[in-house]
Swiss-Prot record:
Enzyme class, broadest EC rank: lyase
Residues annotated as the enzyme's active site: 148 (proton donor/acceptor), 175 (schiff-base intermediate with substrate)
HAMAP family: AroD
Protein name: 3-dehydroquinate dehydratase
Assembly mode: Homodimer.
NCBIfam families on file: aroD
Origin organism lineage: Bacteria, Pseudomonadati, Pseudomonadota, Betaproteobacteria, Burkholderiales
Amino acid sequence: MQSSKPIESHGQPIAGGKLPLICVPLVGHTLDEVMAELAIVLPKKPDVLEWRVDFFESIGDVAAVIAAAKAIKSKAGDIPLLFTRRSVMEGGEKIALNEDQVIALYGAVCESKAIDLIDYEMANETANIAQVRAAAKSNDIKLVLSFHNFSSTPGLEALASKFLMADQLGADIAKVAVMPRDPNDVLILLAATQQASQKLRIPLISMSMGPYGSLTRLFGWAFGSALTFAVGARSSAPGQVPIEDLNTVLGILRKAMGDGQTTP
């Protein structure tokens, strides 16, 4: 029934190809805060961890960022780590780095091999995307090219073009997150996801945000989204559901839909 393509890391499907994967964000401002979050999150057994480095107050210190990434990875063990700088324009925190410095940071973190996946926004210049893609590919790191709209939901064709753009730009995974104004917007996002999952060669991640959009975090996988985000300690976006609640609902949905998978 699912049309989702599993997300891989280092040549293997994450969590044995489980769909959807559950990703929990880490949003601490200091390494101590991040490690405290990690202590809360790890017992809840997420499939992927996302480190939102735009929250990290030492983001301008490349050595400190790499050391923190290695510390997270050491504690996380086999759980893949997604490294993300979210821009202010797409819902992230304000940082004191220009885009050239961000790209240099991405390159250094990729070379450190302390991460498994990296997120970069497809709104960036094509040349910048190419640099990040090259750094990721040369270090066996999967590239997520993402698009976020925190004010509205574009039309079906516009959303479809975003998924296609990520594929054309060389992404390993395409991510689209939008804000619905009504239930119809949620249906548009799900329809775009289903269409894209049938046409594209790469896995997709999609979600509507906010109260209406929380539904997509629960059953978007049935329409082709391979991963969903959940709250482990602190939320990084509106509409995220606590991981415990998400696991419960996913278990019920899988059983109802005849899926043999079980939640951890």
